[in-house]
């Protein structure tokens, strides 16, 4: 595990404090100009942390296709339309944000987006789509996950419900899930990655 670098930790904490302060300023301004109740506020990160600190013991960090490199918190708020305090358990992607905004704002679009709207999950937090697959690619490494499993770049299957640290491969125990995700990964590699 990474040895704690006090200077980097201090810098990271200062950035969090600065971000918190400035998000507060934006919210105060929205309230001041009576725009807050009809403004969608989204907060998330683009990748996991640059060190193994603060990642809930997820495997690896930024620059990895494992959970520690790609799993991030995501907050969305819209006081007039989104019920506060809900927790979505559906695996989502950054690609889902724009289609969701289109649907939330009742706009119609003829564009076929790569992502999907997650508005239905905001309306019903217990809804789950176990067929949904999210692909991650970095430095010729590919992982694919669904709501329960991740198939890492080395083709090891992990049950994230029981093993969020990705320590115990379950390839043999869940061979049908392994085969399904491996097939999906190969198709994605040959149809998407091969274009770039």
Language-model features, listed with the residues they occupy:
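Short alpha-helical functional segments enriched in proximate histidine and acidic residues
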Residues: 22-29, 100, 104, 188-191
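Beta-strand elements within well-structured catalytic alpha/beta cores of enzymes
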Residues: 16, 23, 40-45, 73-75, ...
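Histidine-centered active-site microenvironments of extracellular/periplasmic hydrolases
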Residues: 4, 28-81, 93
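Short glycine/proline-rich turn/loop motifs
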Residues: 1-8, 78-81, 164-166
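A long, amphipathic alpha-helix that forms part
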Residues: 1-39
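Extracytoplasmic/periplasmic, Sec-exported soluble proteins
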Residues: 4-18, 50, 89, 93, ...
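C-terminal cap/loop subdomain of S1 sulfatases and analogous C-terminal strand-loop tails that border
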Residues: 49-67, 82-86, 90-165, 180, ...
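Short amphipathic alpha-helical coiled-coil/interface segments
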Residues: 174, 178-185, 189
């Amino acid at each position: 595990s990474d040895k704690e670098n006090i200077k980097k930790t201090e810098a990271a904490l200062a950035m969090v404090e600065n971000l918190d302060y400035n998000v507060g300023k934006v919210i105060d301004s929205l309230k001041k100009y009576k725009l807050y109740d009809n403004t969608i506020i989204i907060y998330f990160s683009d990748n996991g942390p640059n060190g193994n600190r603060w990642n809930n013991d997820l495997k690896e960090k930024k620059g990895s296709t494992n959970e520690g490199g790609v799993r991030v918190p995501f907050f969305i708020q819209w006081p007039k339309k989104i019920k506060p305090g809900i927790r979505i358990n559906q695996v989502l992607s950054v690609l889902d944000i724009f289609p969701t905004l289109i649907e939330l704002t009742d706009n119609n679009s003829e564009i076929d987006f790569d992502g999907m709207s997650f508005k239905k999950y905001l309306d019903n937090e217990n809804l789950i789509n176990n067929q949904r697959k999210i692909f991650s690619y970095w430095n010729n490494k590919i992982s694919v996950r669904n709501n329960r499993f991740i198939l890492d770049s080395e083709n090891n299957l992990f049950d994230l419900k029981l093993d969020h640290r990705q320590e115990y491969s379950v390839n043999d125990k869940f061979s049908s899930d392994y085969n399904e995700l491996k097939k999906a990964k190969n198709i994605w590699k040959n149809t998407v990655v091969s274009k770039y």
